[in-house]
């Protein structure tokens, strides 16, 4: 029997696994998709928020500030791309200045460090490409940007290294109460566990309702984005927000840790995991963004994408044991600032186990830490040494991002190995650049096929059913005249 079963391995499930892996518990993760971080965690704004937006006294307010500080430490320890660039919330008219004052007061109450109000002149001095109509801004120096999928992957990898089991393509379809805890029905059979952590993202309501009386409703909400080429990456140097409204923090413009510019999102209620991009949605995003940064060159867009976030009707994170279901722990409704809060949210689950007296002493032999080979960032002498040791690092496969064969092979041999083309992209960046895999994609497919010992026809782009190749069009034949 398991001690803890975690349902879902986005950033919340990965953070929970990372925290629990510090203890001698039998813990397993059950992820419905074929990879970690393959839903909301891979398609969001990639912001670690400072914490001025949530209403004081809410879980969001406390866990946002705590989580962002913990995330900074974890990213440093696990070699995850992170940059504390700060954020600006703009007032684009005098009528919006009272809203900035309210956010400032929230920030003070929530313990956000270094937060202050700026004049129009101070704001434009920091970001000269902003609209000249700016009348002021709220500056939060603790806001940061991160690679969200690498953040989740890193925590999940360290958890697996320390004994947590990960079951991919393994949805939980039924939950039943037993004398000793819970029984989960999965494609690989019945799994018994003492505790369940519900970290199922937009599916968290459905998972909760399998085990306990209905308590909350999640409305999946789609947000569409532009990702612009690195030629636009320095258009702004801070995360640029407009004044938020009831639909969220509005359309932002921000640098990314990879050197691009990200613009979005809108907020459209959808059914399920509908990540289609729409002409109307993208037109709204570009028009809204130009209110903040008029000279963005959307002609430099290299990709449009959409993510779905879990808007919940409680107005706050849903955290705790479900009523009438002891041992079933919800970590649900993780809309923004869910990414920022993830490490602190995970610790809330650990506290529940501790309160029940079911948290043993931490492991003495815990193996923390993680390093990555990022070939293009190495000094020349280190590149030469690495190539001499492993010639695959001398063969550049992705020319846009200067990603080598060695890095792709690393992605295919990690604690949680990539099994798809997008899985490789999320781990090492191959296909992330200007051509979006147009040149390197076939070579990545070939390496996946060879390394995993599967037919090229079985290699997926991402989720189940996204086979890149459908059939062979030519076969070698011997012709004799």
Label each residue range with its predicted role.
Residues 2-28:
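N-terminal Rossmann-like FAD-binding beta1-loop-alpha1 element of flavoenzymes
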Residues 15, 175-180, 184-264, 268-278, ...:
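Flavin-dependent oxidoreductases
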Residues 22-42:
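Glycine-rich FAD pyrophosphate-binding loop
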Residues 46-126, 250-251:
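Dinucleotide-binding Rossmann-like beta1-alpha1 core, especially the glycine-rich loop
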Residues 62-65, 90-99, 138-157, 275-280, ...:
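Short beta-strand to alpha-helix junction loop
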Residues 138-195:
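Helical element adjacent to the flavin cofactor pocket in flavoenzyme catalytic cores
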Residues 248, 257-258, 273-396, 403-416, ...:
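C-terminal catalytic lobe of FAD-dependent flavoproteins
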Residues 404-415, 438-456:
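Iron-sulfur (Fe-S) cluster-binding segments and ferredoxin-like electron-carrier domains
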């Amino acid at each position: 029997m398991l001690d803890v079963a975690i349902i879902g391995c986005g950033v919340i499930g990965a953070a929970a696994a990372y925290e629990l892996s510090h203890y001698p518990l039998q813990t397993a993760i059950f992820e419905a998709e074929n990879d970690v971080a393959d839903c909301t965690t891979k398609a969001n704004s990639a912001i670690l928020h400072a914490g001025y937006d949530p209403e004081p006294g809410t879980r969001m307010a406390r866990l946002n500030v705590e989580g962002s500080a913990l995330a900074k430490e974890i990213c440093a320890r696990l070699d995850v791309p992170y940059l504390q660039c700060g954020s600006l919330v703009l007032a684009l008219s005098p009528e919006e200045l009272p809203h900035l004052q309210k956010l400032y007061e929230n920030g003070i109450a929530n313990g956000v460090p270094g937060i202050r109000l700026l004049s129009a002149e101070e704001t434009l001095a920091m970001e000269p490409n902003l609209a000249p109509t700016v009348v002021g801004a709220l500056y939060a120096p603790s806001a940061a940007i991160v690679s969200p999928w690498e953040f989740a992957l890193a925590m999940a990898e360290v958890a697996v290294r320390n004994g947590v089991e990960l079951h991919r393509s393994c949805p939980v379809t039924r939950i039943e109460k037993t004398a000793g805890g819970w029984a989960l029905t999965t494609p690989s059979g019945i799994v018994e566990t003492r505790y369940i952590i519900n970290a199922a993202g937009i599916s968290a309501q459905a998972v909760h309702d399998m085990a306990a009386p209905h308590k909350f409703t999640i409305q999946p909400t789609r947000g569409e984005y532009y990702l612009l080429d690195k030629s636009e990456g320095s258009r702004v140097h801070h995360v640029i927000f407009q004044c938020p409204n009831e639909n969220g923090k509005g359309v932002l413009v921000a640098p990314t840790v990879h050197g691009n510019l990200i613009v979005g999102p809108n907020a459209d209620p959808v059914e399920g995991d509908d990540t289609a991009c729409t002409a109307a949605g993208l037109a709204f995003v570009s028009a809204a963004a130009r209110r903040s940064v008029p000279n963005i060159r959307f002609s430099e867009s290299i990709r449009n994408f959409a993510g779905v976030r879990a808007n919940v009707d409680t107005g706050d994170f849903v955290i705790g044991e479900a009523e009438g279901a002891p041992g079933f722990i919800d970590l649900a409704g993780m809309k923004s600032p869910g990414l920022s809060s993830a490490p602190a949210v995970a610790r809330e689950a650990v506290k529940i186990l501790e309160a029940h007296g079911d948290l043993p002493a931490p492991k003495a032999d815990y193996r923390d830490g993680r390093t990555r080979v990022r070939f293009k960032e190495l000094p020349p002498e280190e590149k030469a040494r690495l190539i001499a040791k492993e010639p695959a690092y001398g063969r550049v496969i992705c020319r846009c991002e200067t990603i080598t064969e060695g890095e792709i092979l690393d992605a295919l041999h990690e604690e949680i190995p990539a099994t798809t083309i997008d899985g490789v992209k999320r781990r090492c960046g191959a296909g992330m650049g200007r051509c979006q895999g147009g040149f390197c994609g076939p070579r990545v497919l070939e390496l996946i096929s060879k390394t995993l010992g599967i037919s090229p026809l079985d290699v997926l782009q991402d989720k189940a059913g996204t086979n890149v190749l459908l059939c062979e069009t030519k076969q070698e034949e011997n012709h004799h005249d």
